[in-house]
Amino acid sequence: RPNLSSEKEEFATARKIDTLDEAMVNADVFVGLSVADIVTPSMLTSMADDPIVFAMANPDPEIDYKLAMDTRKDIIMATGRSDHPNQVNNVLGFPFIFRGALDVRATKINEAMKMAAVKALADLAKEPVPEQVNIAYGETRLAFSREYIIPKPFDPRLISEIPPAIARAAMESGVAKEPIEDWDKYKEALMQRSGND
């Protein structure tokens, strides 16, 4: 279709697709930020192997978590809900991005800083989960898997891992006005601020 912005053109296709149902056929990924219950089990079964489905509509996702999991055993599913695994929530980003940015007096929050947050979260998800996180969420052994692709919001490691990544990215990208020199001391101060020392 004509008159698409450059941002939308990046995701456009020349394929003849008129419906969400058609778009889901052989798709590897679905990212929904729309309304509840627009994705059906048949849409999920038409997707490629090991599909990634981020059904992020709140309060109810594009497809119910249990229905999706019952439909596809190979699915990697995330929602914005705290009562299901893989809750994607901005609480994992904003406080820690701002903390790192403020601590180096960054003049702006740029793409390098946002990507540093993404990478730090991804790396943290692959690390062994502290017992206190398992207890807080009523779990026995959280570990990187289809049901745990992103850290939990109450993971105390977030404060010591995400802000330093943001601060370092701000410094490396030239937007930090007060660089950090002692990273160990900085991490220790972050832990003390949060009561996790």
Kindly label every feature range from the protein language model.
Residues 1-4, 42-44, 64-68, 89:
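Short acidic, glycine/serine/threonine-rich loops at helix termini
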Residues 1-35:
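Glycine-rich phosphate/diphosphate-binding loop of Rossmann-like nucleotide-binding domains
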Residues 12, 33-36, 46-49, 56-63:
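N-terminal Rossmann-like NAD(P) cofactor-binding subdomain of oxidoreductases
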Residues 23-24, 44-47:
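A short, aliphatic-rich alpha-helical micro-motif
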Residues 55-163, 167-180:
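Adenosine-phosphate binding glycine-rich loop
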Residues 180-197:
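Long, charged amphipathic helices and adjacent flexible linkers at domain junctions
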